[in-house]
């Protein structure tokens, strides 16, 4: 009997079962994160661990609709390289690696792919991977960041003003999922240089995009107030993220793939490749 209808983990299927999953047109989820410093109190796997945990819970709830790939655990991290343990991947390497994954699953016949990001600096890269996948295959590829789905709930319970890195948000999620790994006695509050239009970590909520070497402005590796993190908050925002992604999966699975129409009235040079 095939496990395709009940198994949500891509790498747990056999190749004959993969044929069944393709026939079901399961949506493929690719979690992405990073391996980088997260202060004195959190492990360096924060971004990939949190993102993968959210994606796996989505899979557990709707196993007949999705397959979750093993995550991409490394990302664009040179700005954190002054802190031991951080692994940096150059943007072109990351994009090409991710594109090889999405094109592989498209080649096998999966028509819908969702890249879920867990690391702010990867956002423009996964956007490009998704766009290139659509242009270079017959599948549709979407890109999102899981924490967009929890911010509404988090804003109701947050006690800190800055949400950025190793902060109240990430600390709360990690406390909920694996509290034994969090060293809360070492949690601190720390902030970057902030102006009206730009900050040292302008990846969100600023008019100007800018990210400085973190070794220039922090000795802790924290941006925000980690001391406000609690497992109770983490449970609330984890549920919000999972529920949001489940709703997104349902919408994307129903999204049509229409046939392209060529509007030219004169011959085109179809041999040109980009």
Annotated model-derived regions:
Residues 1-114, 120-274:
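Extended, histidine- and acidic-residue-enriched regions that form the cofactor-binding/catalytic faces
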């Amino acid at each position: 009997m095939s496990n395709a209808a009940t198994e949500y983990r891509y790498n747990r299927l056999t190749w004959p079962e993969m044929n069944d999953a393709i026939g079901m047109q399961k949506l493929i989820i690719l979690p992405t994160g990073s391996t980088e410093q997260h202060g004195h109190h959190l492990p360096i796997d924060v971004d990939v661990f949190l993102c993968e945990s959210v994606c796996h819970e989505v899979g557990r709830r709707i196993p007949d609709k999705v397959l979750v790939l093993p995550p991409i655990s490394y990302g664009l991290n040179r700005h954190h390289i002054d802190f031991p343990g951080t692994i940096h991947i150059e943007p072109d390497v990351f994009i090409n690696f991710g594109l090889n994954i999405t094109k592989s699953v498209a080649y096998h016949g999966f028509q819908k792919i969702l890249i879920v990001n867990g690391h702010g600096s990867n956002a423009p890269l996964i956007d490009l991977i998704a766009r290139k996948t659509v242009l270079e295959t017959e599948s549709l590829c979407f890109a999102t960041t899981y924490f967009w789905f929890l911010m509404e709930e988090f804003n109701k319970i947050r006690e800190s003003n800055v949400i950025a890195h190793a902060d109240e948000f990430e600390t709360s999620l990690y406390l909920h999922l694996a509290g034994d790994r969090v060293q809360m006695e070492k949690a601190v509050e720390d902030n970057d240089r902030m102006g009206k239009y730009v900050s040292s970590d302008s990846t969100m909520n600023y008019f100007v995009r800018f990210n400085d070497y973190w070794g220039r402005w922090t000795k802790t590796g924290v941006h925000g107030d980690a001391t406000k993190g609690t497992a109770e908050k983490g449970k609330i925002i984890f549920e919000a993220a999972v529920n949001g992604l489940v709703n997104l999966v349902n919408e994307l699975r129903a999204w049509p793939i229409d046939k392209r129409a060529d509007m030219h009235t004169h011959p085109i040079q179809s041999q040109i490749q980009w």
